């Protein structure tokens, strides 16, 4: 029971949740500064993830993104692993009804693809594996210890398919790294790995370090602003392809629609790239100039100068005195 008093207003409420709902209940171990479970799920939904392809997280940490991706892919309720809720202690709590709802898995779906995670830290991989086991997702998630620059997927025989896959990363933001150069170099390696090892995939990266995000070297297809705790973060989308961006745009499924949109904009607003040249004397205009018309002469201006030596009286002078 919560009571909140503000001036003459008193609010009485019942806590139906108990522990914060962002705590799913599957975490048995943590790495340093793991991402919030609710934020991870929100990022996946914003990216359009519903289990329609393979999923990769090359910096998986404690495995939060991997587990949330598996839950969404199978449409499993996020609070299924919680030990309890606050409303279970209410006097009118219906235990039978709650058990019926809790055990209802009729809306869950089959996940036919796979989820892959990796991290350079052996400890992080161990933590991720424990959490994955706690969530019962070992069948759908594989985690290995491997450095970012050593990842090999695209073009490797027998490797997981990256075409149409989702890649999502929550890299270090720079607060815990010793030097700024280390951060910039890390983000440069991320860009190279995404470009050459995840060809055909769509990548999403969240970070509060805008300067480091520029070092990725890829043009964002989309940008969003999210809050990770108190940090204002960029959440960028990258379309990964071979060759140059202009060539990829021509073969992209939306290229025809983009061409139509451009034609409509040009038709409506004109071509901003059209050439302008100075007008010459011999140029002929395609319109008639305005004909000159004879207008009546303007009336003479009024002359406000005094026509006599008449002056207004000042101070204690009278009208008679002022005329003298």
Question: Where are each of the predicted segments found?
Answer:
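Non-catalytic substrate-recognition/targeting regions of SAM-dependent transferases
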Residues: 1-26
